Structures are given as C-alpha cells and as structure tokens.
UniProtKB/Swiss-Prot annotation:
Upper taxonomic lineage: Eukaryota, Amoebozoa, Evosea, Eumycetozoa, Dictyostelia
Binding site residues for Zn(2+): 74, 78, 155
Entry keyword set: Cytoplasm, Hydrolase, Metal-binding, Metalloprotease, Protease, Zinc
One CC-aspect GO term: cytosol
Top EC category: hydrolase
Localization, UniProt: Cytoplasm
Entry annotation: catalytic residues: 77 (proton acceptor)
SUPFAM superfamilies to which the protein is assigned, alphabetical: LuxS/MPP-like metallohydrolase
Predominant subcellular localization, coarse grouping: cytoplasm
Family recorded in the similarity comment: Belongs to the peptidase M16 family.
Name of the protein in question: Insulin-degrading enzyme homolog
Amino acid sequence: MVANEQQQQQQEEERKEVKLIQSPNDNNKYRYVKLKNGLEVVLVSDETTDQSSCCLSINIGSLCNPREIEGLAHFLEHMLFLGTEKFPVEKEFVNFIYLNGGSYNGTTSPNKTNYYFTVNQESFEEALDRFSSFFISPLMNEDAVNRELNAVDSEHNNNMQKDFWRMDRIVNDQFEGHPMSMFFTGDSSTLKRDDIREKVVEFYQRYYSANLMKVCIFGRESLDQLEEYANKYFLPIVNKDVKVPKLPPLAITSKSIMIEAEPTQDMDLLKFVFPIPDEKLCFSKNYKNASASILSHILGHECQGSLFSVLFNKDYAFSLSISSNSFYENMNKIEIQIHLTKTGLENVDEVIALLFQSFEFDTPEYFFTEKKLLSEINWKSFQKSAPASTTQAITSNLFRVERPEETLKYNNFLEQFAPEKIKEIQSYLRPDNMICLFYSSTKFKGKTTEIEPHYKIKFNKRYIEQSDFDKWKSFPKNTNLFLPKENPFLPIDTTIKAPQDHSIHIPKEVYNNNGVKVYHSLDHRFNSPKARVNIRFELTSYGNNQSMVMWNLLKKSLKEVLNEKILYYLSVLDFSMKLQILTTHVELQCYCFNDIIFTALGKVFDFLMNLDLNDMQFKRIKEKVAKRFLSSHYLSPYQISMRHLSLHNFNCNSMLLDKQEYLKKVTKSEFLNYFKSLFSYINFSAMVVGNASIEDACAFGEKLNSFSNRNSACPGEVFKLARVNLPSNTITHQREFLYDTNQTNCSSSISFLIGQFNRKTYATTLVICSILGSAYFEELRTKKQFGYVVNCAQDCTGNAISMRCIVQSHTKTPEEIFDATMEFFVGFEKTLDYFKTSPSDFKDLIENCQKQNTVKQQSNSAQSSLYWSFFTFCGDFEFEKKKYEDIGKITFDDVKQYYLDHLSPNTANLRIFAAHCYPQSYQIPDEVKPFGNVKVNLLRKYEHDNFKENHGYLSSKVNLQK
C-alpha cells in the first residue's frame, strides 16, 4: 500500500514538472506521462468525442533496413497486424475495429513507423488491449509471413507506374552507399527468402523498444482513467535501452548528378534536390525560427518578382513547388519541382540559370512577421482535428520538440527571426551540391541506356561538370527577379461574430431571388474567425464531351489569370479554393478568414462572368488540360475501371478519348462564347457557414444575382445525374484494354444495382456494408491474396443505391476476380445468418453502425463540409438525424431480405454491371461464362451510348419519406 502511494506521489511530482502548453481555444485536457519502461505518452481527454484513437510511433523506419533485406521495416509493419499471443486469431484486431465503427492503418517512412486506429468510444479499452499486444507479443506465424509477402509485393506493384514513387526512387538511388539509396517498400525480390521470418523477428527484437516509442491515447475518459490504460496496456512493452543507429550525413560525396528519365504520365519537369547535412540546421528542430519554412515560402512564391512569375511570363513553366524534408538531424533536403511548358522544355538551361539567380537574396523580416501573425491567429483559434489526426500529430511532434511541454504548439511556435540560419541553408543551394532530375515524356523516349531494377525506370546518368556551371552563369541577370512585396491581404478583423455557447445552428435559407439561393449558419461552437462558402452551379447543360472540356479549361484559367494578383497571396493565408468538376455537378468551395473570403469570391465571380483570356493564356491552359487528359490514361487500373463503370451507368457520356479529340479542335472564341451562353441561364445554390453574418450571406447572394445578362434557369431544365436502369436477372460485362503498355495490373469494378434511393433501403445498405467491407477484404485480399486494392462499399451516386466491389490484381485475371466475388456473395449468407443466432451481436452491429454514420465533427471546416455533403446528396441539412433514426429501425429480417433480393447470386432481381480493365499483355476473352439462369451480356468499347439508350434511367428524385 505504501509503495503504491509513493509511486502515485512520484507520478504527481513528474506531472507538475511537465505541463503541456495549450491553446486558449482548446478545451481538451492533456497530460504527459513517462512510464517506468521509458515510454513517453500524451493523454488526451475529450469529453465530447464519439470516437477514440491511439497512435504508437517508433523512431525506426526504412533507413534502418539491412542493406541485404530492403523493405524489412515496411514488411514488419504489415506483420504486426496479423495476430499476437494474447489474440492469436489472425484478423482479430482488424475485425474488431471494423465491427466497432473504426479504422486502422500503419505507415512506414524513412525515419519512423506509425501504427494507429480509431474506434467507437465504448470499445476503446478492448481495442487498446488488442493494439498494445502488437508491441508485446506478436506471433508472426510462418503462414502469415508468406501471405503478407504477397501483399507487400502487390503494394509495390500498385506503385510501379506512379511517377511520385518513381521520381523519389531514382533520386534517392543517387546517394550511393547511403541508407537513403535503399529500396524502402520492398517486394518479393528483396523479401522472399527462406529465413525471412527469422529476419523480421530479429529486426523487431533489435529495434522495437519502449524507449524509442511515443504513444498518444485519445478518449472520452478522464485523464486518470487514460493513465491507467497507459500503464495497464503499454507498460509491458520491454525497454531494451536501444539507441537509434547513427546514420551517415546525407550529402553529395562526389560531383552533382544529372538524371534524364522517362515518366509514366505525360509530363516534363525538372526536380532539384539539395541535401543539407548540417545538424544545427535540422529543419524539424528549428521550429522556433522556421528558417527552412520561410526560405521555402520565398522560393516557392508565385507573385510578381518570384522565380515562378518570371518563368510563367516567359511561358517556361506551368507550376513550381518546393518542399523541405527532415529525416534525422544530419539528413535534410530541399526539393524544387518545375513543371515545364513546351517552350520551357526547349530552354532548360535558362530555367536552371534563373533558378540559381533566384537564390541570391537577403531575407527581409516581413516574411517572418507575416508567418508569425498567421501562426498566432491559428493558435488562438485552434480547431480540433479528427481523433486519428490528433494522435498522429502528437506522437510525431514528441520526437521533434526540445521539451515535452511544447508538443501541442509545435507547428505554431515562432519566436525569433533567424536570417543567419536562412542564409546558411541558402549556402547549400549550389549547382555543385545537387541532384537534378530531368523527367520528360518526350525528350528521352528511346534514348536511355540504364534501367532501375525495382520500378523499371529508363534513364541516363551523368555528372554535372564545370562547363555546365559556366553555361548557367553566363545567362544575364534577370531584372524581373526580386523579392515579392508584403502580403496585402493579411486578416485584420478576426472578431468572433456570435457568442460561443456551443448551440447548434442548422443552415437556413436566408436569400432566394431569381434562381439564387443562399443558406446560412453562424458558428456558435468552434470559435474560429474563418468561414466556408460552397456554391453549386446549376447548369442547363452538363456531362457531355463539350461541357467537360470547357469546364476543365475554365478551371485552369482561374489560376492562369488570378493567381499572381490575388489567389497566391490568399493561399499562404490558409485560403483554400477548389473548383470541383464532379460527376453530378460543378461547385466552388472556399474556406478562409471571414474578412477576406467575400472579397476573394467577388474577384473570382467577376472574372467568371466577364471571362476573357489572351492568346498566350488560352494556349497555356489548353496545353495544361491536354496533359491532364493524357495523364488520366495512366491512373491506377482500379481508377480506370471505376471511370468505365461511371461512363456506362450514368447520363454523362464523356469518354476520355473523345474529350481529347474535342480539346484539340476547340478555339479561344468557342471557349469564351460557350460560357457567355451558359452563364446567361444559370442558377446558384450557396451555403455560408462559420464566422459570417446573415448580412454577409445575403450580400453575397445579391452579388451572384447582380451579374448582367444572367437569367434564372427553369428548375426542370437543370441537369440532374441519373443512373441507368439495369435489367433484372442480368449481368453485363464491359471489357477494355488499358492504355498504358507498361501496366501489369488488371482491375474489375463490379456494381450490384439495388434501386432508387429511399430511406429504409439506404439505412439497410449502411448496415449490411458495415459487415460486407471487412468480410470482402479479408476473403479476397487476406486469404486469397488477389491484390493490394480490395474494397466493397455502398454508392449512392445519381440518387440510386448500389453496392460496388473493386479489386486490382497483378496475379489474377478479371474473370477470376468476378468469379471470386460471386463465390464470396454465395458464402456471405452464412456470415449474415450468424447474427440471427446472436441477437445481442446484431444489436451491437446496429448501434455501431449508427455511431459510425453520425460521428461528431471537431471543427468548423469539418462541420460545414458535412452540411454541404447532405445538401448536395438530398437537399436536407438535417439528414444525419434521420439516418440515425432509420438505422435504429433496421431488423435482421430487413438485412437478410435485402441480401436475398439484391446480392444473392441466386436472386431473379440480380442487376450487375462489371467493368474490367486488362493489361495489353493479357488476352480479352471473346465470350462470357454463363451464370446459372442469369442472362449475361458483353459490351465492347464505344457501346456505352447505345447501352444507355436501350435501358433508360432511374428517376433522380430523392424520396425522403420513411
């Protein structure tokens, strides 16, 4: 008893020493605890949360892989989810999380590995018990090892044609002899060996030690209860007193390198990587002066005087981006990417010369002052994140801060301006300290001599010589390069407009005139000076080739014309704006400080309603859209099969090849006249939520209504997406080759049409999906190893309900995927019937489904996004409440009948459309296999219009009656 009291007293003393700095707008309760085994834990108590979360991060990642077993750290991350001594059933944890409304994941980065989950609050302790056992007694059974090898191999195969992974790999490979040059993901060629289980266990035993781990536990419980959980479940993790391996500095050891490589997608870019090995400049440790962040902001600026502005006005570049990355203290790098135009492609040396000219400046203090002001406002008006985002951020920050007290404020901790640090970083941005990747889809085709072994990247490599330096120096100094001016749009008025009494205010209609409707909700809960505005464009024509091409051109024209004067300045103030070209409609989303959001939107709509471009601008946006369309052919196969599914099942008939052909022919005058005509008959529905008054919302409605030559469109003429009415007792297969000749994966998207939307059917769909998703994943991915991408979920696009299964595989054919899917649905009846024998489990299923579909939002941004999703789905801002009630009324008999009527392969109501994509190395069968008494159809390419015309469409009206 005395010992326990002494232990409690000691813990109380330690807590007094560590008090986490907390935002005045954050009502969570926090506690830092260091367990006896050396494990550092942050506890977060949020008495309002519906979901709980835990994240464990370990300061060991892919950089610690043994050179002879590349990918081992990533493979271990996979293995820890597959059974422990306490919970030996392989998918015990995964199934528990899914059945209790949660999600989980693991990520392996170069310097750390993260494991995290969310779950319904009531199941939190049980989830912690299962989760913590990963780090105490994992099984890593031999058969699980062999199966998960296939999963890792499939994951790599899924990434092989993605240029992000390819660029990263070919650049890192140049740090010869350094751990950074290793193949981080791993595949069967690096991991398939007789002793792989022994090696993965050895890696775990060597590095997985409590003193290298950080944990964050987030729940509704009190801090004392959460601390009890921490001791109960994480104290048994062994402290082996392991040190993170001392790795060599990341540096250029000989000459700078030029890599010339072929991308997968249509792109021409230059990527510059500058390693910075100086430990005192470590980016993640210099968070109180943000020197790397300020330098990145200046170099990546897009307004007048910036490098991008010069390149843009010379028609050399479409875009420029910069990132600063820190792995360990002696491993930092700055990366700059420039996407080139056709003109820029012919002037690469001048582009490089201008890049190095742009590095020559002294940093004025106003860049720091602006960043500090924004940081202070964001800290003062702190907005909660989703539980999993919170736990991941906290564990990550624990590794970076000087003192645990600073963990929560890590990203908002600007204290001193350090121009000397910025100057030191600049000193590493030299032509003799870089790797340059020239990544071009046209320049090097058929002209490369080397092949990278893991991603099959075709490339050339040469050292950069003094003659290159001299050539770049020979370009005259460009007088248009200078430091951009101070930001003219800094927020001035951040006054909160409503009392923060935590009352809920559903958006209400406050303006309705001449085809313009505005809905408004003033925030009383989140104490944020920001607002969100969403605008739906209600169009008389949409979904065809012409409209899709024109809207893509318009989207590019926004940044083309407005970026330098206003949009970029706003973007650095946490202003986000997206013109979304969706299957259902077009919408503009905007989120920003309330005192500038309507000014920005006014400028945007003035541009849209008075659209004009010069010839150079139109040429450039047309080139951008052409690249985007061509790159769409190189998406992952599962994304392409989903696109084919949409093409054949909805009243939008925009085929990618047709869009490309139409784009080639369209002229500037046709583009301008199209929107002049379209905007003469258009309606708008807008939602204003957050720190904006009714007067602000109504004034914005008046702005939308004031445009000359605009008339309201008749509601019956406004485009509405509708779903094809698939025939009963019929399976329709659509087969097509993939465009990418190097793609080795196939994919199938299989849709079971349920019918028109109604509330009971939708609620039943949500209930059955809460079982289906994990069961389908376990069967086709875990057990049968069909591939990395396996998913089953509901889809209500076009106000019709369907169940959609997606699989991508490099080891199976689409026919095998389809057969396995149908076999799964035959066996799924037994899974359902279990709940008939266990009413208590069915009751739990219903309750968990309710919780999963009505999660409390943690911020103004998240809440407003949820409101908008309900409005665009069914026009009812309070649909969440109805959904909760409807799910609660679903019985087992409802679920079983739903299965028998719509999903059982034996039903006469079966309505399936299956879109299959084949690599060009495959043979597409000419016939389709019969399936019992079900009629089976086969469609080929270009038959979508006839198919839709023959079958007609379901009504797109939403029935909100019970």
